[in-house]
Amino acid sequence: MVLLSFSLRFIAFTLTITLTQIADGFQSRMLMNNGLALSPQMGWNSWNHFQCNINETLIKQTADAMVSSGLSAIGYKYINIDDCWGELKRDSQGSLVAKASTFPSGIKALSDYVHSKGLKLGIYSDAGTLTCSQTMPGSLGHEEQDAKTFASWGIDYLKYDNCENTGTSPRERYPKMSKALLNSGRSIFFSLCEWGQEDPATWAGDIGNSWRTTGDIQDNWKSMTLIADQNDRWASYARPGSWNDPDMLEVGNGGMTKEEYMSHFSIWALAKAPLLIGCDLRSMDKVTFELLSNKEVIAVNQDKLGIQGKKVKKEGDLEVWAGPLSKKRVAVILWNRGSASANITARWAEIGLNSSDIVNARDLWEHSTYSCVKKQLSALVEPHACKMYTLTRRKA
């Protein structure tokens, strides 16, 4: 009887632990299944161009420009406020407060304005005691309260940074905000920004909708190419609902040439990276708009198959990047990272096609089609430029 009683207690204990693990696992995956980020997020973020020089007028004007330019109609929906929007001290109730001098109407009024334009409003906080600017408090230890505050303001997106983190692992800090958002009563996109320090691709898919794989991007060729390579390492972890994030776009900020920005946008699109514009939308020039509004390139990024393309071939400075698309298509980039024009070739076996396949090759930047291409695709590519294609198999 004693043995039977012990056995029953052990079984009950084991069952309790197992059910708890199942429940915890289910809860951890619920945020990923919040119905958001079925394709990579598209929108705008204030940091790259404005850093702390932000106010509610700028955010409203940016929302206006997103609509009037036509960018919102092709998928750019998030207007994301980055660091420096809040007061240094919380209020008497312990809540975050919008900075009176720059956001006098408050975040709720701003959210209402952005929503009235058919857009979504994002905001920024930090999994530490202060944000990275050290001008406002972080959310560490205030996750539930801040998540409810964000929800009450109508926030749609949270970028969650990693400064002033007390030396605690992000694996301990980030799930707390994930659960808080889950319990906030509002579906809020959760963007983890721990700079790839603890390989978030391997664990963040159960916690958030995207995760930074790298440090901050800079508006220059060296930074952009380095980050593209670092992000490529984690390609197999991306999936609908959870994406690798190599940081925001620098297109239009002036530090690179047109060809370099074209390469930047093309690689980000193929890599299923978030397409978050980082320039001043109110004054972007024609070239910037044409790059950011290329519907054919954007379609690769937003393809419903949701498989991240990656580097498949490297010969010195000449590279081939490729990835599968829906309807058995393939996206291909021929990228010249060198200083002289060069021919680049992608052979069918290198990009997932059969040697017998005959394809139509659609040039996504020239908006032209090459019919009945066999065995390989070649092009002369200018320095720091790329060619981007979608390949569609022809029926026998």
Swiss-Prot record:
Compartment(s) of residence: Secreted, Cell wall; Secreted, Extracellular space, Apoplast
Major site of localization recorded for this protein: secreted
Annotated residues for binding of substrate: D82, D83, K159, E194, W195, G196, Q197, E198, R212, D216
E.C. number: 3.2.1.22
Induction details: By Verticillium longisporum (VL43), in apoplasm.
GO molecular function: alpha-galactosidase activity
Span of the signal peptide: 1-25
Enzyme class, broadest EC rank: hydrolase
GO cellular component, one term: apoplast
Gene null: resulting phenotype: Increased rosette leaves number with a curly surface leaf morphology and delayed flowering.
Active site: D161 (nucleophile), D216 (proton donor)
Cystine crosslinks: C52-C84, C132-C163
Domain of life: Eukaryota
CDD domains, per the entry: GH27
One GO term of the biological process aspect: leaf morphogenesis
Keywords, in A-Z order: Apoplast, Cell wall, Cell wall biogenesis/degradation, Disulfide bond, Glycoprotein, Glycosidase, Hydrolase, Secreted, Signal
Biological role: May regulate leaf (and possibly other organ) development by functioning in cell wall loosening and cell wall expansion.
PANTHER family in alphabetical order: ALPHA-GALACTOSIDASE 2, ALPHA-GALACTOSIDASE/ALPHA-N-ACETYLGALACTOSAMINIDASE
Subunit structure: Homodimer.
Descriptive protein name: Alpha-galactosidase 2
Organism of origin: Arabidopsis thaliana (Mouse-ear cress)
